[in-house]
């Protein structure tokens, strides 16, 4: 069809319905009445010859064709919005903006202290809120702007997202300094004989450790499994268990909990830690500023 047959305002309504899945909510956010939104949807359906959204018990569900249109429409509207607002600026020292960042507990331990120290000097009124990448629907939350940036190994963030490599995690074995039998460098035989504490970190690269070890024919004597890395330090401090952890995490635990590390006896691949943001906010001045700060503070490149 010819682009001249489409009213740009109809695409704005389409985009809002994609985000809210509700005619009334979309109308409220756009400053339109519910009948006006319904009429816009009717016109767009006629122009595109598709229902686009179907009313269900869960709200207005997009059709396959609507989902096919979603990314290019969102990208086009965002590009146009950026072009119209290029004069906007971001003053970090004066800003009171809250940035929502998705990361694991390891991410909080590694990223937050240097980030908050830098913000205290450069952006004293900015607030940071963190959440887990698997706490909800991360793709939708980043598309809607509810989450500004995500950090980690997040293979689900592909189409519609930009990413920047920060560094690579190397795995090590960690245990208490006065462990009766664990030594560095640790052999595969010793690694297999000792008892382990493991972390089930779903939807992160760290959740692949068991699979990597099994494919290498290495079995762990798993004594304890926990859902968060944050518990590993205190547990190793008071037990004879050992753990497979990222090296940067180990550095933060060694002194506070009296721990030490050994190069990992298994040839585990490094884990790439990337910074992700949605294409809609690629030119958002505040998002750009915070991304650059992360690169400055944490990038190995």
UniProtKB/Swiss-Prot annotation:
One GO MF term attached to the UniProt entry: DNA binding
Name the UniProt record assigns to this protein: HTH-type transcriptional activator NagR
Gene3D superfamilies: Periplasmic binding protein-like II, Winged helix-like DNA-binding domain superfamily/Winged helix DNA-binding domain
Organism: Ralstonia sp
Function: May regulate the expression of the naphthalene (nagA-F) and salicylate (nagG-M) metabolism genes.
Alphabetical list of InterPro entries matching this protein: LysR-type_TF (IPR050389), LysR_subst-bd (IPR005119), Tscrpt_reg_HTH_LysR (IPR000847), WH-like_DNA-bd_sf (IPR036388), WH_DNA-bd_sf (IPR036390)
Residues covered by the HTH lysR-type domain: 6-63
Keywords: Activator, Aromatic hydrocarbons catabolism, DNA-binding, Plasmid, Transcription, Transcription regulation
Regions recorded as binding DNA: 23-42
Pfam families membership: HTH_1, LysR_substrate
GO term, biological process aspect, one: catabolic process
């Amino acid at each position: 069809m010819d682009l001249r047959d489409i009213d740009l305002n109809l695409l704005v309504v389409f985009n809002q319905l994609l985000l809210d899945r509700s005619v009334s909510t979309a109308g409220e956010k756009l400053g339109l009445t519910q009948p006006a939104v319904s009429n816009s949807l009717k016109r767009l359906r006629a122009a595109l010859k598709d229902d686009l959204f179907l009313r269900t018990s869960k709200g207005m569900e997009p059709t396959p064709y609507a989902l096919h249109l979603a990314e290019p429409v969102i990208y086009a509207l965002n590009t146009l919005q950026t072009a119209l607002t290029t004069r906007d600026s971001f003053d970090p020292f004066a800003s009171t903006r809250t940035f929502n960042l998705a990361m694991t507990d390891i991410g909080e331990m590694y990223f937050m202290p240097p980030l908050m120290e830098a913000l205290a000097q450069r952006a004293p009124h900015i607030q940071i809120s963190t959440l887990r990448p698997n706490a909800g629907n991360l793709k939708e939350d980043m598309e809607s702007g509810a989450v500004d940036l995500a950090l980690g190994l997040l293979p689900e963030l592909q189409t519609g997202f930009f990413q920047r490599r920060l560094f690579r995690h190397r795995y090590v074995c960690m245990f208490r300094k006065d462990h009766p039998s664990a030594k560095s460098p640790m052999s595969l035989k010793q690694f297999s004989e000792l008892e382990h504490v493991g972390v089930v970190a779903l939807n992160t690269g760290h959740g692949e450790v068991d699979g990597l070890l099994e494919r290498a024919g290495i079995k762990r004597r798993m004594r304890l499994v926990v859902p968060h890395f944050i518990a590993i330090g205190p547990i190793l401090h008071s037990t004879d268990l050992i753990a497979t952890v990222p090296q940067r995490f180990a550095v933060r635990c060694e002194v506070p909990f009296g721990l030490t590390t050994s190069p990992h006896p298994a040839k585990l691949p490094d884990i790439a830690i990337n910074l992700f943001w949605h294409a809609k906010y690629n030119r958002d001045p505040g998002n750009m500023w915070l991304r650059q700060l992360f690169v400055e503070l944490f990038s190995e490149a």
